[in-house]
Structures are given as C-alpha cells and as structure tokens.
C-alpha cells in the first residue's frame, strides 16, 4: 500500500465559524464531558433496557466494536477517521490493530485526541491526528488508505458530494468505507412546518450545524456512495440499539426543558432540545450504519507489510 503522503502546501480549511462555535460552547463541552465522559457518539445495546448503565462500556467499546466489525478490514490496515473529534474511536481502532489517521477542524478536540493517543501509549504510526477538513483531502495521496469511516461526523458536511468524492479517491481498490450517521425516514419537505416537534428537529440541525442530517432521508447515503463510485452498499438500521441512551437523555432533560420553555429561553440550551426532540421524534429518523466497497481485489492481511 502506498504511504499516506501529504503535499508541502497546508491543507485547505473551510472556515465553519458556526460549527466551531457549537463545539467550543460551554453547553457542548459540559454535556459531552459530564454525561458522555468526553465521547461524542451514541452507545450500542444488543437489547433494549431502561437501565443503560454503565455507559462507558457501551459508548467506548460496544459502538466502536460494531463499527470495526462492519468496516471489516484486516489488522494493519491504514484507515482515515474523518471527523475524529476527541479521538476515542481512533484510539479503539488503533488498540485493535488498525493504523489510524484522524482529522478534525476543532483545535481543542485535536489536542484531546493527541493526548488520548499518547496516554494509551500509541505510536504515531498507529494513531496520528492532524487539523484537516474532510471536504479538502487534496494533500493526501490517492489510494493511500485501506478504509475510511465516520462516526456521527458526516452530518456536518456542507458539501457531501465533494467530501464523498474525496473519500473515494484516497481509498485504494478493494478498500472499505463505514459510516454511522443519522437520516430522516421521510424528507423534511413532508413535515408540517407549524408542528413544534418539526421546528425543534430543524432547530437542532441548524444550531448544531448539521445540514446533511437535515437533507438526508431514506436512500440518501446509499445514493451518495454509489454516485461517488462505491459498490456493494449495505444500510443497517441501528436505531433500536441506541434507544437506551435516547431514553436516558430524554429523562434527564424533560424537567429543565419544561422550565426553560415556560420562560421562552429553551433555545439557549440546544443540547437539551436535541435530547428532548431526538427521543420524542424518534419515529421520524433512523440511526444508520452504512458500508460500501471500492471495487477491486479484497485486501489482504498487512502483517507482512
């Protein structure tokens, strides 16, 4: 496999001010740290339960294990974590034999991800993290990765077609892509604009800067992958497997939500609205895990490489 080469020029960055503001807000940092232990993705439960504890094993092991299973690459594979956040997924992948190159645009998250790698004793060959925008992968060599994955990060894409074309270019033939993301069950245009839940779901996507979440409906990701050139697309519905954490978040925020709504300032706490509307509106969206392949021979084990 070719090395992950970069050009001398600095990677192009989209100055997404709103996205940076969301992740740098005290609301987001406190919620993710206190409730999620820093992890920025849902957990995975094999069976529904009203007692989802302990959260850590479901957040940092079960979901990451499921992602690794569906990515289905041999140990030693070089993978791109597009939108790596604080690096918990990348760390898990590296600890289980992958060589991970994580990219993100949020400065504090990049520093946390690097610290996570260092604290885990991972070499830069096993896990490295750089500031880079997944819409602009021109500084990465073509066919330099065995796979790419996103974990609840592609919803932030402002140009999903461009980002997907970049993923396709950097993945070698036979390589894989796995995406764990959110899509609507029906297009937004079919929702009643005067319905409060409709308004809150749109507010969440707007305030958390997730235009692709707002646009995505059934077959959206399948079509996006196929248009980019990927084949053998498989879409899995994992929403039943995240219900325990959706229900937990809902139970934690309902009393403060009603209080702040009484005074008309609930919009100041967007993660609270996200937790409320996510569970209340769960019949309107799906949590999907999508995989696809770039046509070519199946990748071999990298033990000898």
UniProtKB/Swiss-Prot annotation:
<dbReference type="InterPro" id="IPR029063">
    <property type="entry name" value="SAM-dependent_MTases_sf"/>
</dbReference>
<dbReference type="GO" id="GO:0003838">
    <property type="term" value="F:sterol 24-C-methyltransferase activity"/>
</dbReference>
<dbReference type="Pfam" id="PF08241">
    <property type="entry name" value="Methyltransf_11"/>
</dbReference>
<comment type="function">
    <text>S-adenosyl-l-methionine-dependent Diels-Alderase; part of the gene cluster that mediates the biosynthesis of ilicicolin H, a 4-hydroxy-2-pyridonealkaloid that has potent and broad antifungal activities by inhibiting the mitochondrial respiration chain. IliD catalyzes the Diels-Alder reaction that converts the acyclic 2-pyridone intermediate to 8-epi-ilicicolin H. The biosynthesis of ilicicolin H starts with formation of the tetramic acid by the hybrid PKS-NRPS synthetase iliA with the partnering trans-enoyl reductase iliB since iliA lacks a designated enoylreductase (ER) domain.</text>
</comment>
<dbReference type="GO" id="GO:0006696">
    <property type="term" value="P:ergosterol biosynthetic process"/>
</dbReference>
<dbReference type="GO" id="GO:0005783">
    <property type="term" value="C:endoplasmic reticulum"/>
</dbReference>
<dbReference type="InterPro" id="IPR050447">
    <property type="entry name" value="Erg6_SMT_methyltransf"/>
</dbReference>
<comment type="similarity">
    <text>Belongs to the class I-like SAM-binding methyltransferase superfamily. Erg6/SMT family.</text>
</comment>
<protein>
    <recommendedName>
        <fullName>S-adenosyl-L-methionine-dependent Diels-Alderase iliD</fullName>
        <ecNumber>2.1.-.-</ecNumber>
    </recommendedName>
</protein>
<keyword id="KW-0808">Transferase</keyword>
<dbReference type="InterPro" id="IPR013216">
    <property type="entry name" value="Methyltransf_11"/>
</dbReference>
<comment type="pathway">
    <text>Mycotoxin biosynthesis.</text>
</comment>
